């Protein structure tokens, strides 16, 4: 057997060997794209381009963000990676090259800049030292018995992700701002493509709804729906005032306010199977009967469901490994079905309108 393996290695062509090396190094250095994106976000390069009339040279960018002149050549190298990655577009003319925004970098414009949506805080949620450091503990987490008993995040930091968010105001503010951004984008898409999921509803509780971005979007589109947000007391205490939304501090494992519909956006993927069953049972206690419009609406990844394009499919799997750091998981349909049935629900429908994520309607 060993001899056959050696023979197969020996017959690898020169081109195969070369391509294998290139692919391996490409995987190893893929993190550079993430770090370059984070740097561009923190430097507010998208803002600089936007404020310069939508097109900016390296000199323009350096002046706007306050770079030292010695860093101009380094900025060119950074922008070269980001243009190849599709974050910006470069236009080579007779003079100095100019950079413009793409649909991706338009999402990185800051609050003070005219924009429809922004996801700059989500970039910081994904690409930050706390999250990245957790991934360096993967080997220990897989192989050391003591480490395997806790989350990947706990191995790296000695506390859970949620404890750090609660105790570190700067980290907590960044995380919650990111969730607001993500919810705003997701709800805009849902209300454009599948607003029917909210029609005929009189009342809705958004469980784990944070500062109320989802509920606010629902109320704007359907003013007659009575919306409540349930989250931990220290979260709702910081929620912005909204006369159309009631904020309730509490624990989703203990009590969920009664409503026609309970909505959970990206909550269950943070929990293991048994806890998800408990949460869904609480949801079932809270909602109306099915013939009265009662249902649970989940916004979650269903691995293998959605777009057939490579990037969304890969994103589902990347999300799944990323969620290991909180001991979370992205589930396939059969895993979701098992949770629903064990919690006492009769049926469900998957609506794959979010590319990577789906709407799941679950019926009592």
Swiss-Prot record:
Q: What is its EC number?
A: 2.1.1.4
GO biological process per UniProt: biosynthetic process; melatonin biosynthetic process; methylation
One GO molecular-function annotation for this sequence? O-methyltransferase activity
Keyword line? Cytoplasm, Melatonin biosynthesis, Methyltransferase, S-adenosyl-L-methionine, Transferase
Positions contributing to S-adenosyl-L-homocysteine binding: 208, 231, 251, 265
Q: Where in the cell is it found?
A: Cytoplasm
Q: How does activity depend on pH?
A: Optimum pH is 7.8.
Q: What induces it?
A: By senescence, abscisic acid (ABA), acifluorfen, salt and cadmium. Induced by copper. Induced by butafenacil. Induced in dark-grown etiolated shoot. Induced by UV-C.
Q: Is Iron a UniProt keyword of this protein?
A: no
This chain's function reads: Methyltransferase which catalyzes the transfer of a methyl group onto N-acetylserotonin, producing melatonin (N-acetyl-5-methoxytryptamine).
Please report which protein family the annotation says this sequence is part of. Belongs to the class I-like SAM-binding methyltransferase superfamily. Cation-independent O-methyltransferase family.
Subunit info?
Homodimer.
Q: What is the protein named?
A: Acetylserotonin O-methyltransferase 1
Q: Which species expresses this protein natively? A: Oryza sativa subsp. japonica (Rice)
